[in-house]
Structures are given as C-alpha cells and as structure tokens.
Amino acid sequence: MSKKKANAPTSNTIALNKKAKHEYHIEERFEAGLALLGWEVKSLRAGKAQLVDAYVLLKDGEAWLLGSHITPLNTASTHVIADPTRTRKLLLHAKEIAKIVGQVNQAGYTCIPLALYWKKNKVKCEIALVKGKKLFDKRATEKERDWNRQKQRIMREANT
C-alpha cells in the first residue's frame, strides 16, 4: 500500500490569466500539451509562472506560446542557460490547429492562454479563441457582475 503525501496540493492549477476574462469574449477552449525543459518543470512545481501578456502564435502548422514567464529556481542546473521568456511549443492535433488557424484568420479573433495546470504528471495549457471586448462591453459585464452580487446579498438577507 502506498501512502498519500501529507502536503499534496489541493489544486492542479499552476497559473491563471485573470485578465483574459475581462479583456476578451471567450468563444472556444482547447487543451494543449506543453513542450518544456527540466528546469521549467521544476519551476512550475514551485508555482513560478505568469501568463499575463502571453499569447499563441500560429506558424507553419504549429502553435507556439509566447510571452509567458517561467521564473527559474536558484537551484536550477548551471550548465543550462535558463531563459524565462523562452518560446514554448504547444502540442495540439493537426485538426485543432487547422480550426484555430481558420478562426484567427477571420477578423477580430485571436488565441490566448487561459491557464496552466497539471493533468496527471503532465503540464497542460488551456488556450482559447477569443474576440476583443469594447469598452462598453467591459462596463456592461462589470454592471452585470455587480447586480448579481447585489442580488445574492439581498437573497441572503431575506433568508435570515
């Protein structure tokens, strides 16, 4: 019998792109694998990743993750030069890449990463086809969110 680790993390999420839901309308989501180096996996286990200004570049039938930042650990290997903003390859099926390329070539669509997470012992990246929000759209979603919060508050007070 194997024992479970006492300090096992409860969440599989490594990093979230919180700005994405505010800046874009999310149309469709995809799960992509990530080609990483050893020091990057160690850093991700420590939770040292950011997706703030990251985006997906589609080139020659391949998908690449640009702008993501994985901070190297101090204990990382000395014989490998660690580049925190290295371009990383996304692993997708050819049909998925073709679908994304077709949508991105339409006006207004782009592809961005939403989250990095663990699935079994592999790092996965959730990417999405998105359309940019206008300023009035952002205001409308903010008003809707506030109204939903206020409704919840009123319902809670009415039930007590």
UniProtKB/Swiss-Prot annotation:
> By which gene is this protein encoded?
smpB
Subcellular locations according to the entry: Cytoplasm
Q: Which organism is it from?
A: Marinobacter nauticus (strain ATCC 700491 / DSM 11845 / VT8) (Marinobacter aquaeolei)
Q: Name one Pfam family in it.
A: SmpB
Q: What is its main location?
A: cytoplasm
Which Gene3D superfamilies does this one have?
2.40.280.10
Q: Which UniProt keywords apply?
A: Cytoplasm, RNA-binding
A single GO BP term for this record reads: trans-translation
- Its function? Required for rescue of stalled ribosomes mediated by trans-translation. Binds to transfer-messenger RNA (tmRNA), required for stable association of tmRNA with ribosomes. tmRNA and SmpB together mimic tRNA shape, replacing the anticodon stem-loop with SmpB. tmRNA is encoded by the ssrA gene; the 2 termini fold to resemble tRNA(Ala) and it encodes a 'tag peptide', a short internal open reading frame. During trans-translation Ala-aminoacylated tmRNA acts like a tRNA, entering the A-site of stalled ribosomes, displacing the stalled mRNA.
Similarity comment: family membership: Belongs to the SmpB family.
For this UniProt entry, the molecular function terms from Gene Ontology, in alphabetical order, are:
RNA binding
GO CC: one term?
cytosol
Recorded protein name is SsrA-binding protein
- Signal peptide feature range: none
